[in-house]
Amino acid sequence: MTQSLADMRRDYTRDGLTEAQAPAEPFALFHQWFAEAVKTEQAPVEANAMTLATVDADGRPHCRILLLKGLDEQGFTFFTNYESAKGQHLAANPFAAMTFFWPTLERQVRIEGRVVKVTPEESDAYYQVRPLGSRLGAWASPQSRVINGRGELEDLLKATEQRFTDTQPHCPEHWGGYRLLPERVEFWQGRASRLHDRLNYRVQGADWILERLAP
């Protein structure tokens, strides 16, 4: 390693985030930041990529990267195999956290809350607009289970293709969406000297409380 990890750092130079810029609820600010990220971030960064953290039945945390596929006044939506590891975690502990990081904008958003399944109709609507290969893959892959090499997965895909030779695949019952209902949303804006801006929204009854956190 040519550079010590202790010496690896970058300076943050963009404008800060003030309470005057923060609306009464976090969704409007997320929409604004997300729109700016879509315009600004370039490959390999995907603006809707996020880290999803879940906790299993033994209290052990697990993280992975996946894509945000829906956002409305209720919450943040993603889709997956309900029988996957994350699906099993959410069945045992229906709380999760998301983190978005947009390096060009020097911004991060952390979201925490309860997770619920979306309706079968909503899952099917999204499933039908996915590429054919992805729709077949949702049937073929026993997600998170141990398999005997890549060949087994390719054999499963071939069998699935044959199954749906004469018909379009429909949404499997074991596949669909989850919606995270936010209880806490923190907006982080990088600032000089590591004195970052952190504005935190938290639910209190039917209202959102806005607070500034020390960096």
Curated annotation (Swiss-Prot):
In short, the EC number is 1.4.3.5
Q: Which cofactor does it need?
A: FMN
Metabolic or biological pathway, per its Swiss-Prot or TrEMBL entry: Cofactor metabolism; pyridoxal 5'-phosphate salvage; pyridoxal 5'-phosphate from pyridoxamine 5'-phosphate: step 1/1; Cofactor metabolism; pyridoxal 5'-phosphate salvage; pyridoxal 5'-phosphate from pyridoxine 5'-phosphate: step 1/1
Give yes or no: UniProt keyword Oxidoreductase: yes
Which top class of enzyme applies to this chain? oxidoreductase
Q: Quote one Gene Ontology molecular function term.
A: FMN binding
What does the record give as the reaction this protein catalyses? pyridoxamine 5'-phosphate + O2 + H2O = pyridoxal 5'-phosphate + H2O2 + NH4(+); pyridoxine 5'-phosphate + O2 = pyridoxal 5'-phosphate + H2O2
Q: How is the cofactor bound?
A: Binds 1 FMN per subunit.
Cited InterPro entries:
Pyridox_Oxase (IPR000659), Pyridox_Oxase_CS (IPR019740), Pyridox_Oxase_N (IPR011576), Pyridoxamine_oxidase_dimer_C (IPR019576), Split_barrel_FMN-bd (IPR012349)
Keywords, A to Z, come to: Flavoprotein, FMN, Oxidoreductase, Pyridoxine biosynthesis
Q: Which GO terms describe its biological process?
A: pyridoxine biosynthetic process
Gene3D superfamilies, A to Z: Electron Transport, Fmn-binding Protein, Chain A (2.30.110.10)
Positions that bind substrate:
9-12, 69, 126, 130, 134, 194-196
Fetch the Pfam families from UniProt: PNP_phzG_C (PF10590), PNPOx_N (PF01243)
Enumerate the residues binding FMN: 64-69, 79-80, 86, 108, 143-144, 188, 198
To which protein family does this belong? Belongs to the pyridoxamine 5'-phosphate oxidase family.
According to the record's subunit comment, the protein's assembly and interactions are: Homodimer.
Q: What does this protein do?
A: Catalyzes the oxidation of either pyridoxine 5'-phosphate (PNP) or pyridoxamine 5'-phosphate (PMP) into pyridoxal 5'-phosphate (PLP).
Which protein are we looking at?
A: Pyridoxine/pyridoxamine 5'-phosphate oxidase
Q: What is the lineage of its organism?
A: Bacteria, Pseudomonadati, Pseudomonadota, Gammaproteobacteria, Pseudomonadales
